[in-house]
UniProtKB/Swiss-Prot annotation:
Protein name: Palmitoyl-protein thioesterase ABHD10, mitochondrial
Physiological role: Acts as an acyl-protein thioesterase that hydrolyzes fatty acids from acylated residues in proteins. Regulates the mitochondrial S-depalmitoylation of the nucleophilic active site residue of peroxiredoxin-5/PRDX5, a key antioxidant protein, therefore modulating mitochondrial antioxidant ability. Also catalyzes the deglucuronidation of mycophenolic acid acyl-glucuronide, an active metabolite of the immunosuppressant drug mycophenolate.
Tree of life domain: Eukaryota
Active site residues according to the UniProt entry: S152, D249, H279
Family to which the UniProt record says this protein belongs: Belongs to the AB hydrolase superfamily.
């Protein structure tokens, strides 16, 4: 019932330039408070209220420099971890940054090595290298406790980050979490096709989200990713976890989020399914649910600290 109510609400937590009346957040801005508020008028969409943050680079000895944008603010901070070959300037990343700005919380978004504005060669990318990228962002840029928001493959990496940095990662939000998915999908291919991919060195994976109609995934990326699979055993993550997934997702089955929920050791886990959402989950209602979830976790963590 709660999920259906969320999906039906048209409200949005405003930034000032949207022209809403100010929403007075008390010491505990819970999700129930947000849902109880009715907007005076529908907001203009995200681009109307964007305020640019400058592009910076994290210099790393012997590793590619990472492009990032950091919004300073209070804790917990939010780090957005993008999907496969996705950039930091996607709809979800920008919406999260704007939401954090409205609350005064810190936010970091970045490009993986070999992707977007970061240094490196995408054909040499591996999941292990991107895992190091995420840990570099957490270790070198993030101050204090962090909530990680992982989209698709970024959801897989957020779990690894939570395992590696339990003292700093205090909550997780997965959007179409693609834990093990690339390896699982490859292993489901016919034997003949897998041999062909091995010979060519590239898997042309069909995708309606690519302009070319396929994602060209390096065979080396798939084989290296096998070393990072998580769903075969309990996942040692104990922080609060929220997993959002669209039931129309034809890339990562929503059952994957159920598997993650079952495998993690945390007892504070919610899986929220949206009946008509697809893999990208970037429609207005999807973004609303995402920022509501972030706000509720911030409220929950503040309550625990206090």
């Amino acid at each position: 019932m709660a999920v259906a109510r969320l999906a039906a609400v048209a409200a949005w937590v405003p930034c000032r330039s949207w022209g809403w009346a100010a929403v007075p957040f008390g010491p505990h801005r819970g999700l129930s408070v947000l849902l109880a508020r009715i907007p005076q008028r529908a907001p203009r969409w995200l681009p109307a209220c964007r305020q640019k943050t400058s592009l910076s680079f994290l210099n790393r000895p012997d590793l590619p420099n990472l492009a990032y944008k950091k919004l300073k603010g209070k804790s917990p901070g939010i780090i957005f971890i993008p999907g496969y070959l996705s950039y930091m300037n996607g709809t979800k990343a920008l919406a999260i940054e704007e939401f954090c700005k409205s609350l005064g919380h810190a936010c970091i978004r970045f490009d993986y090595s070999g992707v977007g504005s970061s240094d490196g060669n995408s054909e040499e990318s591996t999941l292990g290298k991107w895992r190091k990228d995420v840990l570099s962002i957490i270790d070198d840029l993030a101050d204090g406790p962090q909530i990680l928001v992982g989209s698709s493959l970024g959801g897989w990496l957020m779990l690894h980050a939570a395992i590696a940095r339990p003292e700093k990662v205090v909550a997780l939000i997965g959007v179409a979490t693609a834990a093990d998915t690339l390896v699982t999908k490859f292993n489901q291919l016919p034997v003949e096709l897998k041999k062909e991919v091995e010979m060519k060195g590239v898997w042309s994976m069909p995708s309606k989200y690519s302009e070319e109609g396929v994602y060209n995934v390096q065979y080396s990326f798939i084989k290296e990713a096998e070393h990072h699979c998580l769903l075969h055993s309990p996942i040692p993550v104990n922080c609060p976890i929220r997993l959002l997934h669209g039931m129309k997702d034809d890339i990562v089955p929503w059952h994957t989020s159920m598997q993650v929920a079952d495998r993690v050791l945390s007892t504070d886990v919610d899986v929220i399914l949206r009946k008509h959402s697809d893999h990208r989950m970037r429609e207005k209602a999807d973004i609303q649910l995402l920022v509501y979830t972030i706000d509720d976790l911030i409220d929950k963590l503040s309550t625990i600290v206090n």
